[in-house]
């Protein structure tokens, strides 16, 4: 009998990793057990407060032993992931893993740690995995150059409750400001302040929270900061804007990009890993180094066509199949 365990250091937070696995669990017909830091004593990671660090390794190990899985998917490289990997190695359990986040780049930005050290750790962590799931082709190419093995592409999806009916599209009046939306964590590595600097050029709405929330809200008075929004409320916000702006240059994917596209929003972003794997330049968005220009360029793209094509391309059921096929093959 197949018994699958999902081991993750990120499950209760609002981020792309948690969103991915919760949606996978919502659509799967398989029986999957989950182990995460919220089940044990934990502390927040100082550099990334939303991440919980579990400090009860023996309890985690014996919890896994009690579940007695035949296959394990290790979602993250934190303490839960490390203990799950150790369990697999000691008990000859097949496992797959996933690469979600460019933590080496984050750590270099935050504390100056050379990326070579972090990537050396990650390479060793994923070395025995039967399949290392990556979110995009450009991410896969980057990791191959760094010496990673067994890389497998893993797509994402969008939930139905995050898709709202499109209002009738009108050509944007040049005398009115373009309505620009950004959704995500408000922190230094997300580069959101580059968009904030354009507060006098566009009507900007920012959805999300994080370490920079209060700082940005106090500094940029012409921007609407809404905090976290979910489900249908978030879908309505997507549908009521003209352009979605994705500012990060260090993400491996960007689920919010496909959420925006599935609501018909053209995307303005940098030509970097993540956006360039999702956005068709000059078709459903504009990729370039100048965010202001990119926003203006894609502001009158056909939202109905963007939405129609995006909804065909992104499915959680397809993502679920890819995840478990790679684990059970």
Predicted segments — roles?
Residues 1-40, 321, 328:
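N-terminal subdomain of nucleotide-sugar transferases
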Residues 173-190, 196-205:
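Conserved donor-binding/catalytic core segment of Leloir-type glycosyltransferases
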Residues 249:
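Aromatic "clamp/platform" in nucleotide-sugar-dependent glycosyltransferases that forms part
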Residues 266-269:
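Short hydrophobic beta-strand element within catalytic cores of glycosyltransferases
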Residues 293, 300-329:
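A charged, aromatic-enriched C-terminal amphipathic alpha-helix characteristic of glycosyltransferases
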């Amino acid at each position: 009998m197949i018994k699958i365990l999902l081991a993750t250091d990120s499950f209760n937070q609002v981020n792309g990793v948690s969103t991915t696995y919760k949606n996978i669990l919502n659509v799967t017909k398989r029986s999957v057990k989950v182990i995460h830091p919220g089940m044990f004593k934990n502390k927040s990671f100082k550099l990334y407060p939303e991440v919980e660090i579990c400090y009860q390794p023996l309890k985690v190990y014996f919890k896994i032993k009690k579940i007695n899985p035949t296959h394990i998917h290790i979602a993250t490289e934190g303490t839960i992931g490390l203990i799950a990997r150790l369990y697999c190695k000691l008990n000859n359990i097949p496992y797959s893993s996933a690469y979600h986040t460019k933590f080496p780049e984050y750590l270099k930005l935050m504390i100056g740690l050379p990326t070579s050290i972090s990537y050396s750790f990650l390479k060793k962590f994923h070395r025995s995995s039967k399949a290392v799931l990556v979110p995009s082709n450009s991410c896969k190419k980057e990791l191959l150059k760094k010496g990673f093995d067994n890389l497998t592409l893993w797509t994402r999806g969008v939930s139905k409750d995050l898709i709202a009916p499109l209002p009738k599209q009108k050509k944007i009046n040049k005398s009115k400001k373009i309505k620009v939306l950004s959704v995500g964590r408000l922190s230094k590595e997300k580069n959101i302040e580059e968009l904030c600097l354009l507060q006098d050029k566009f009507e900007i709405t920012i959805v999300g929270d994080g370490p920079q929330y209060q700082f940005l809200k106090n500094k940029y008075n012409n921007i609407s900061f809404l905090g976290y929004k979910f489900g249908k409320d978030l879908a309505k916000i997507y549908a009521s804007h003209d352009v979605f702006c994705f500012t990060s240059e260090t993400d491996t994917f960007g689920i919010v990009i496909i959420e925006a596209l599935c609501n018909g929003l053209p995307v303005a972003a940098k030509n970097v890993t993540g956006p360039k794997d999702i956005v068709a330049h000059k078709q459903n968005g504009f990729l370039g180094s100048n965010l202001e220009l990119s926003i203006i360029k894609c502001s009158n793209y056909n939202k109905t066509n963007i939405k129609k094509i995006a909804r065909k391309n992104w499915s959680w059921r397809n993502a679920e199949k890819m995840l478990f096929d790679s684990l059970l093959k």
